[in-house]
Amino acid sequence: MAKQEQRFDYVKIALASPERIRQWGERTLPNGQVVGEVTKPETINYRTLKPEMDGLFCEKIFGPAKDWECHCGKYKRVQHRGIVCERCGVEVTEPRVRRHRMGFIKLAAPVAHVWYLKGIPSYIAILLDMPLRDVEQIVYFNSYVVLNPDNHSELQYKQLLNEDQWMEIEDQIYAEESDLEGIEVGIGAEALQQLLQDLNLNEESEKLRQEIAESKGQKRAKLIKRLRVIDNFIGTESRPEWMVLNVIPVIPPDLRPMVQLDGGRFATSDLNDLYRRVINRNNRLARLQEILAPEIIVRNEKRMLQEAVDALIDNGRRGRTVVGANNRPLKSLSDIIEGKQGRFRQNLLGKRVDYSGRSVIVVGPNLKIHQCGLPREMAIELFQPFVIHRLIKNHSINNIKQAKKLIQKNDPLIWDVLEEVIEGHPVMLNRAPTLHRLGIQAFEPILVEGRAIQLHPLVCPAFNADFDGDQMAVHVPLSIEAQAEARMLMLASGNILSPATGQPIVTPSQDMVLGCYYLTAENPGAQKGAGRYFANLEDAIRAFEQGSVDLHAWVWVRFDGEVESEGESDEPESVVAADDGTVTKTYRFRRIRETEDGQRLSQYVKTAPGRILFNNTVQTALIH
């Protein structure tokens, strides 16, 4: 069947009417039979391993379990496409229809939807203008509610009555001289449905607008809240009584699968257990109503049905959580949808993509700002197609299979080819949450040992990253255009300024500031080798590396260049004349030797190996 392109502007989520829910699951077969209602709690027949008819995996309702084959086996093969078997009523089609065909359960008694009853705010309580506690008392069969007080002087509309009060009123109604006829009292979700049906939304909306104009403070805020809910119902053309369910949709069986394990046992989705509880209780309630069982038994069964539906929709929202084997709470429909591991965040918003990887980040201070350290293990996996292509093209490997074998064996040739492939091929690094465009940047990969991604410390502020266990994702741009775009627009060395403020975002912080401070700090406690003289800067560094001079020890180093020294007096602290006519002037941080006519012969600077290292690093960076 050709797929039709359906254009739409937006997706709207609204309340579904009972008719709409039936429509989702109901289908009419060519013989006129209407199917869709799930009436049996059975899943599959454990002898034949075929789905039970009218059960939770019924082939008549949801479609065939095997390709082009009906339940009884009368029709097999694709040539019978579209035929509905006269014997078993199963349409001969592909089993993938079991991923979207729905069913429904017709409830023997109305049930309140737990989202609208126990959600925050409780929309049922807001619409009825009753406290949530009172609404719960009605739904779970603890209190009666007055639906029609008629001419009784002591009763009011929506008033709650306990068992004793209702029995007292019943006695008054059935007394011989009584003129009380029209009094109506209800309990359970049926009573709630009646109250919601009696609501005239347009009238309520008008009345509330008048009341809001006259009131203020807390009362006004409460009225506005109620008006907003009523206006939303009017706007979406939904009816309040739809918050009480008469029909429950059954999601397609392939979305709640049952699979056979090696030992012959079955693993099943939690939803099947929850649906089974609902069907069992619903069937038992229908049977009790048929045989006109005592009211107290019927009422208890209705309460149990309400609790079963609550558990199916949102297990644990109210009352005891339904648990399965090992005391593990069963996963309800809400649990599947909500949260980080739910359908939206896990599968729809954040899909797994090919040519991507993820690992912990560690600092790579030896990297250039536009580079990142990519673990070899990760790189060979991400760049595999490029490596295979290069192997076949240049290294007399005949086919992909051969190339893959080389990769699996970790042949030394592979690493040389990988080095060639990644040269000039940028990768993109992303750290969640990506709050601005600098949350994903391009880097040139450098192969490193280990399993951690190395990141230049200066790009951390842009990613809001630190090295306490943060993870980052790597993505490989595949096409030439994507690579060019990554290099031109996204390379880290081109994203120096914040797009939001225009201020530099690549600023040294934390470890780098501490390192700079430590190199240049004064430390009177570490003065090993202090006072020594060195012919040049390299000699001083070598002495430090050999351990004969401390990092912070004050030493004299010959340096004939210009020296800027703040806080140093122009007048020397001492002047010493030598026999050869030369003069040595000693300042706070310098010692200069001059001829008689003032010509400089040599200059020694008082510094520390740490400061020499800092100076060399800055100079090298500026030159390159």
UniProtKB/Swiss-Prot annotation:
What GO terms describe the biological role, i.e. biological process, of this protein? DNA-templated transcription
Reactions catalysed, semicolon-separated, are: RNA(n) + a ribonucleoside 5'-triphosphate = RNA(n+1) + diphosphate
Q: Keyword Transferase, does the record have it?
A: yes
In alphabetical order, the GO MF annotations are: DNA binding; DNA-directed RNA polymerase activity; magnesium ion binding; zinc ion binding
Q: Which InterPro entries match?
A: DNA-dir_RpoC1_gamma, DNA-dir_RpoC_beta_prime, RNA_pol_asu, RNA_pol_N, RNA_pol_Rpb1_1, RNA_pol_Rpb1_3, RNA_pol_Rpb1_3_sf, RNA_pol_Rpb1_clamp_domain
Task: Give the cofactor note text.
Answer: Binds 1 Mg(2+) ion per subunit.
Q: Which UniProt keywords apply?
A: DNA-directed RNA polymerase, Magnesium, Metal-binding, Nucleotidyltransferase, Transcription, Transferase, Zinc
- Pfam families given in the database record: RNA_pol_Rpb1_1, RNA_pol_Rpb1_2, RNA_pol_Rpb1_3
Q: What is this protein called?
A: DNA-directed RNA polymerase subunit gamma
> What gene name is listed for this protein?
rpoC1
